[in-house]
Amino acid sequence: MLKFYDREFSSRLLIGTALYPSPKIMQDAIRAAGSQIVTVSLRRETAGGRTGDAFWSLIRELDVTVLPNTAGCKSVREAVTTAKLARELFGTSWIKLEVIADNDTLQPDVIGLVEAAAVLIKDGFKVFPYCTEDLGVAMRLVEVGCKVVMPWAAPIGSAKGIVNRDALRLLRERLPDITLVVDAGIGAPSHAAQACELGYDAVLLNTAVAKAADPVAMAGAFSLAVEAGRTAFEAGLMEARDFASPSTPVVGTPFWHAVS
């Protein structure tokens, strides 16, 4: 089972709610993914008016856990304020914390992120921080009280998949008791499977499903990929080798194949 703070879930695929061709397709895709947790932007919900009400109605029909985020925030103050508004609106202490340093790369402001996380945790929030794959940053987030860390695979929406595999592997090795979620940069089901094969507890994605030619079918594909990757990790993957190693035993080889 996947554990986030004091709650357990069976699905290891978290999915976003933006960019879909229609609300109905979004709803069908989330169902196909089997996701139990969806991320929602506070800015979309508060700016939507009646459209926001209809969107929220669709989310309630799915019977999923909502993880609001602070997407678009560029300062500690803005992120903390947005998180507090999200707690009031959605009735949850969970927050996906994003503090963005640059609009072009959407790279996290890791200094502001740690500061904001510390403030929110003291205020009773359960923080899900979006960060880079830097081990030092992840350790600081854990030190201030984060039980979940969400490093990117690649920049948001880039669809590049895992760019720094060694760094993500190191995070998993050094933070064995922390729930780790690969967040951002996933473009194909194979990328999600690779993340789970590394031992990551879950994958969070949005654009790869929402912008697919068939979002519903793609959501199903990601669900299968995450399950396959996790099963492979638990089964124990063989280590890569630099040289060939015969898979067929030589014992019992017919004598005429023997080399004199």
Swiss-Prot record:
The gene is thiG. InterPro entries: Aldolase_TIM, Thiazole_synthase_ThiG, ThiG. GO terms for cellular component: cytoplasm. GO terms for biological process: thiamine diphosphate biosynthetic process. It catalyses: [ThiS sulfur-carrier protein]-C-terminal-Gly-aminoethanethioate + 2-iminoacetate + 1-deoxy-D-xylulose 5-phosphate = [ThiS sulfur-carrier protein]-C-terminal Gly-Gly + 2-[(2R,5Z)-2-carboxy-4-methylthiazol-5(2H)-ylidene]ethyl phosphate + 2 H2O + H(+). It is found in: Cytoplasm. This is Thiazole synthase. It is an enzyme of class 2 (transferase). 1-deoxy-D-xylulose 5-phosphate binds at G157, A184, G185, N206, T207. Belongs to the ThiG family. Its EC number is 2.8.1.10. Catalyzes the rearrangement of 1-deoxy-D-xylulose 5-phosphate (DXP) to produce the thiazole phosphate moiety of thiamine. Sulfur is provided by the thiocarboxylate moiety of the carrier protein ThiS. In vitro, sulfur can be provided by H(2)S. Pathway: Cofactor biosynthesis; thiamine diphosphate biosynthesis. It comes from Nitrobacter hamburgensis (strain DSM 10229 / NCIMB 13809 / X14).
